[in-house]
Regions:
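An N-terminal, well-structured beta->alpha segment
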Residues: 38-80
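N-terminal amphipathic/basic leader segments beginning at the initiator methionine
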Residues: 1-47
Length: 244
């Protein structure tokens, strides 16, 4: 788990930071623009943040609608940042810890094409799951750095489990930003991965799976079901945008 979802600190943001707030197919979409000055007070990277909020009905009965809404935002980001080179998806976290498994679960449903040199019309997609430092003995940052230096992608997409201090956001929000992630967990490096780290455009996808109360982390009793649905929604959205 890494940073909290931006919505946790939204109330402390100035009103003009909320660029747009719309509702589509029962999904609330909030677009925030964070500046370098804001970073000093809320400790979030500067950039564009899109937060999707939804209820049980959307997640369980209308996931196709949720995917369509998500695809619109992802399409905008891909059009802006993907210039035809390799896209490197990085699934942060551990598949063995349910509350930290969103990244690996999403990547498990994505299509990897980077090795298919004969199919020139296919977008080049590479997948990498570094696992946690206590499993590998190597910091996640160092592993990612080696892969980035080898592949030289033109876009990095990080996928990770987030935390939240507001129970209403647990399992019912999704964040997409073009800023990055700071490894706040003690099991990982304290280094951050942002678009400045490797001088490569970067997207970050975060799903809050753990509720932080004081120094305790709790998860929802339906977490496994919700994780399976959301990981499929996110992966399917990317697969359709890249390969359909």
């Amino acid at each position: 788990m890494n940073r909290n979802i931006l919505l946790d600190v939204a109330e402390s943001l100035e009103k003009e930071k909320l660029i747009a707030e719309t509702k589509e197919k029962d999904v609330m979409i909030r677009h925030y623009l964070i500046t370098e000055n804001d970073k000093k007070t809320i400790h979030e990277e500067a950039g564009d943040y899109f937060v999707f909020s939804f209820d049980d009905m959307v997640l369980y009965e209308e996931k196709e609608s949720l995917k369509k809404v998500l695809k619109k935002t992802l399409k905008t980001f891909l059009k802006k940042y993907h210039k035809g080179g390799t896209i490197l998806f990085i699934g942060l976290g551990s598949k063995n810890i349910l509350g930290d498994s969103f990244g690996p679960k999403v990547l498990n449903n994505l299509i990897a094409t980077n090795a298919y040199n004969d199919f020139l019309i296919l977008p080049k997609v590479a997948l990498f799951t570094p696992d946690t430092t206590n499993k590998t003995g190597i910091s996640s940052y160092k592993l990612i750095e080696m892969v980035v230096n080898h592949l030289k992608p033109d876009l990095i997409i990080l996928v990770d489990s987030f935390t939240t201090t507001h129970f209403k956001n647990l399992n019912r929000t999704l964040e997409v930003n073009d800023c990055g992630i700071c490894f706040a967990n003690q099991l990982r490096s304290n280094k951050e991965i942002t678009r400045k780290t490797f001088n490569i455009p970067l997207l970050s996808i975060g799903y809050p799976t753990m509720f932080k109360m004081h120094k305790t982390y709790l998860n929802h009793f339906r977490l496994e079901k919700d994780l399976n649905i959301m990981s499929e929604v996110v992966a399917s959205a990317f697969n359709e945008l890249l390969f359909d």
